[in-house]
Amino acid sequence: MKKVHLKIDGKEVKAEEGMTILEAARSVGIDIPTLCYHEKLAPYGACRLCTVEIDKNGKTKLVTSCVYNVEDGLTVKTKSPKVERIRKMLLELMLASAPVLSERAGEYGIEKPRFESDLTQCILCGLCVRYCAEVKGANALTFVGRGKNRRVAFVDEVVNTGVCMDCRECFNVCPTGKIPRETDGASFEGITVQDVLAKAGSK
């Protein structure tokens, strides 16, 4: 496999061609925060928390490191002032929906989110949807609605026909950590993940 030479946070890195910046960074112990990334799934780039700043031929720009492949001569900054500002803003937005992110938010000096709280706590990262489709092959979850009405919903046709194995693994990958592992055998027909979260939050 051809090797690609780049620099990440001042460190010379040799990475395999086809690797993403995120993979290359982690291979040498450089931490880039993520929420929607999962090693079993294809890169998605939804949460944007893994944004980094790259310098390519003297031109700088921000890219999502989980979907951007390494290139020869690339210079990457994972903690530039611009990157830190963006991560802080993203975390504040997500913290309003998922208080469990408070530990990561604390790293960026966020004590209290500026944004209105959404008690459903779903951050729409898509991990549960993608895990169900790519790993389990069930496609029992999907996105519905647009904009502020966007939600993750169970697909009735799949749930009702038994294609959904009721494995609850989609709950386990949720980065908010707020979906209950046990739901008392409740049916998921006609409800959304947000409904499950809201019910759990009311207990």
Give short role names for the model-derived ranges.
Residues 7, 28-32, 69-71, 87:
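Flexible, acidic/Gly-rich N-terminal and inter-domain linker regions that tether
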Residues 48, 52, 58-172, 177-203:
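Fe-S ferredoxin-like electron-transfer domains
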Residues 1-11:
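Eukaryote-biased recognition of intrinsically disordered, low-complexity regulatory segments
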Residues 11-12, 160:
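A generic secondary-structure micro-motif detector
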Residues 10, 38, 119:
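Aromatic-flanked redox-active Cys/Sec active sites in thiol-based oxidoreductases
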